[in-house]
Amino acid sequence: MLVYHLPGTLDTREADLDLLWAAGATGLEERGGVIRAYFDTRTELPPQVSDGEWREEADQDWLAEFKRTLRPVRAGRVTIVPPWLREEVEAGQLPLVIEPGMAFGTGHHATTRLAVEALSALNLATLGPRGTGARVLDVGTGSGVLAIAAALLGAGFALGVDIDPITIPIARENAQINGIPASRVRFAEGTLGADPLTFPDEGVDTYDVVVANLYAELHDLLAGEYAAHLVPGGALILTGILTVKLPLVHAALDREGFTNVQETLDGEWALVTARAPLG
């Protein structure tokens, strides 16, 4: 069995995980401060993940071990689970089924859980035009988990956008697994501010909620676009922020006129919520 040992944890090397999947990894797990990436054959890896080493190890059922370590993740009114744990969702919770795979976002990372909790705290079903359900924009959608969570929580329409084309079919498949019709959740490759992300003919010219699980420097860059895509007073949910980077995010939101800025901390990670300018 061919295993690539990469120093670090799934948290500290979060930005590199998609590089391993794209290089052909068939599974990832973390043991003792080392990420173990399983491959069928040795392959050339990008520079960002070249600080590890290849090892031949005795065969084992790593997939069974990987499944054994995954547990349901409760986030507000939603419980995120892989397909084989769906029956473990508690009564009264909304099951959100995500197949672990190439796109980041299975709910086990604090940033994903914080964002779903923030969505759960909003009354999405009563927002939007005439109270028919919020219009939600998920920036950097990955597996689609946040857009799907929004739909499960009552959003009338959710759009998940990502610059990585690999994620889009995965997100669509996850929406289908969860029984969310394409009329309520869509996924598209695109960049906020560079591509049209509204559907005026369908009443989606702005959004009631924008949620983005990115990183602080991108939030700083996109703060103006967040404001432009939100209705006056709309809800902004930002995560993927290291606590040491919070001043950068606060400064960006202040610059763009956001109000009611609040933060939630979980270890080294932070979530920031705010309200868009009223005009």
Curated annotation (Swiss-Prot):
Gene Ontology CC annotation, any one = cytoplasm
Keywords assigned by UniProt, alphabetized: Cytoplasm, Methyltransferase, S-adenosyl-L-methionine, Transferase
Phosphoprotein as UniProt keyword: no
What does the record give as EC number? 2.1.1.-
One GO molecular function term of this record is:
protein-lysine N-methyltransferase activity
Reaction(s) this enzyme catalyzes, per UniProt? L-lysyl-[protein] + 3 S-adenosyl-L-methionine = N(6),N(6),N(6)-trimethyl-L-lysyl-[protein] + 3 S-adenosyl-L-homocysteine + 3 H(+)
Which terms does the UniProt entry file under GO BP?
A: methylation
- Amino acids binding S-adenosyl-L-methionine: T112, G140, D162, N213
Location(s) in or outside the cell: Cytoplasm
| Main EC class the enzyme belongs to | transferase
The source's domain of life comes to Bacteria
Q: Name one Pfam family in it.
A: PrmA
Question: Main localization of the protein?
Answer: cytoplasm
Q: Which PANTHER family match?
A: ELECTRON TRANSFER FLAVOPROTEIN BETA SUBUNIT LYSINE METHYLTRANSFERASE (PTHR43648:SF1)
What functional role does this protein have? Answer: Methylates ribosomal protein L11.
Query: According to its UniProt record, which protein family does this protein belong to?
Result: Belongs to the methyltransferase superfamily. PrmA family.
Indicate what this protein is called per its UniProt record: Ribosomal protein L11 methyltransferase
Which organism does this record belong to?
A: Deinococcus geothermalis (strain DSM 11300 / CIP 105573 / AG-3a)
